[in-house]
A protein has these predicted regions:
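C-terminal non-catalytic regions of proteins with extracellular/luminal or membrane-system context
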Residues: 1-428
């Protein structure tokens, strides 16, 4: 009996000791640096062998931070020059003539999107606060920007989308971002035409409407939730006031007050492009510029004036209506059950089921159209031309070409290849 009691006591004591050692060990490991410092214990020893070992694995070619920054800005602008996509250019609306007068419309013109969300958002505030704004970028390219309209948009921040931030120097800018859950509120309020000053009706060679949207990791869109300030559509379609401005710009164009209407798409997301060919708006040119970085607006000016020929191609399929995109069905504000019990700092609790698999974008549109034409699969009725506004890989250029077929050579070999000899000539 005594033996059993003694064994039980020993087991209990050992259990307590093991528990203390486990917990104590974890605490000690977590605070090892502080404990070693307090006890004066060093866990490392530097042995100098007398040999010289290079400490820089990648030697810099720049002599200062300023020189490094200038080089990175040059790369940024070169990337924009080669990446911008000319989607529409009726009657050679672009490039604009040297010294052309332009008016910038939409609050987005003064709250341009320079950086994205998620991993790139760490420096968004710094990039945005120090970026070259659109007016300065166009002015540097020789364009004459309507100062009165620009200043009005700058002063009326109640029409800005996103949060208005004032930096230490008193400069205001906007940050457009969501929160750590799907369905973040995105606003496309902008200013209606009736609120604009008389400067909006100034004579100009071109009216440039800026459409900015921003989202991504940590700032997901919920397509089934209308954006604040919109009576129809969603955040990736034009808002009511943006459409109102376009309608009135067409009126000014018909009256001869402005020469042409240009739309800049300032977004990395797939905007609905139903507006581009809508006769109610009279849009002459559409230029996709993406998210431009700190100095990308300089490149926009050079493309608009023809100093640089746009040669980019779309990396996505753009739809007239995003409801025709199969991923639309899986977008929304889906949350894990009981996710609200998590601390706010860890409430990334949204999820999406990618039930469309790889069949999104061009993989979906091209496959379904092929099946429809060939009468195979389960394609149903499908009108490609009424669904896709701009396909994957699309992009125009200011350059025009004439081609001539010089001959055809057929080779009888294992790959049964055919060679076409074609002469291409630049005509402008």
């Amino acid at each position: 009996m005594k033996t059993k009691l003694l064994s039980k006591i020993i087991c209990n004591v050992l259990a307590v000791i093991v528990g203390l050692l486990t917990v104590g060990g974890a605490i000690a490991n977590a605070n090892a640096s502080a404990i070693n410092s307090f006890l004066g214990v060093s866990t490392q020893k530097v042995i100098n062998t007398g040999t010289s070992t290079p400490v820089n694995f990648y030697d810099t070619q720049y002599k200062s931070v300023d020189e490094l920054r200038a080089a990175s800005e040059a790369i940024n602008e070169k990337t924009l020059e080669e990446g911008m996509v000319l989607l529409k250019n009726d009657n050679n609306a672009l490039p604009l003539s040297a010294g052309a007068s332009v008016s910038l419309y939409s609050a987005n013109s003064v709250t341009f999107v320079y950086a994205g969300s998620g991993s790139s958002s760490n420096l968004t505030e710094n990039v945005t606060a120090n970026a070259v704004n659109l007016k300065d970028g166009l002015t540097a390219a020789g364009l004459s920007v309507n100062e009165g309209l620009w200043n009005w948009y700058m002063a009326n921040d109640q029409y800005w989308q996103g949060s208005v931030v004032t930096d230490k120097n008193g400069n205001k800018y906007s940050t457009v971002s969501g929160n750590r859950k799907q369905g973040a509120t995105f606003v496309t309020k902008d200013a209606p035409w009736s609120a604009l000053p008389t400067d909006a009706t100034n004579q100009a060679e071109a009216a440039i409407l800026v459409v900015s949207r921003n989202g991504g990791e940590n700032a997901d869109f919920a397509m089934n939730t209308k954006s604040a300030g919109m009576t129809s559509g969603d955040y990736l379609s034009l808002g009511d006031n943006e459409r109102d401005v376009l309608t009135n710009l067409k009126r000014l164009k018909e009256a001869g007050t402005i020469g042409k209407i240009v739309v800049l798409i300032n977004s990395a997301n797939q905007l609905e492009c139903d507006f581009a060919d809508n006769p109610d708006y009279g849009v002459d040119a559409v230029l996709w510029v993406g998210v431009v970085g700190s100095t990308g607006t300089n490149a926009i000016g050079r493309v608009l004036t023809g100093a640089v020929n746009p040669s980019g191609r779309l990396a996505d399929t753009y739809f007239y209506q995003n409801t025709a995109n199969p991923v639309y069905d899986t977008d929304g504000n889906m949350e894990y059950d009981n996710a609200d019990i998590l601390p706010n700092a860890k409430n990334s609790h949204g999820y999406i089921v990618y039930k469309e698999g790889i069949y999104n974008g061009y993989r979906y549109t091209e496959t379904r159209y092929e099946d429809y034409v060939l009468g195979q699969g389960n394609a149903g009725e499908y009108e490609y031309a009424q669904t896709v506004s701009y396909p994957f890989g699309y992009g125009l250029s200011y350059t025009t070409f004439a081609t001539r077929l010089d001959g055809v050579e057929r080779f009888v070999n294992k790959d049964n290849s055919v060679t076409y000899n074609v002469t291409a000539t630049v005509t402008n």
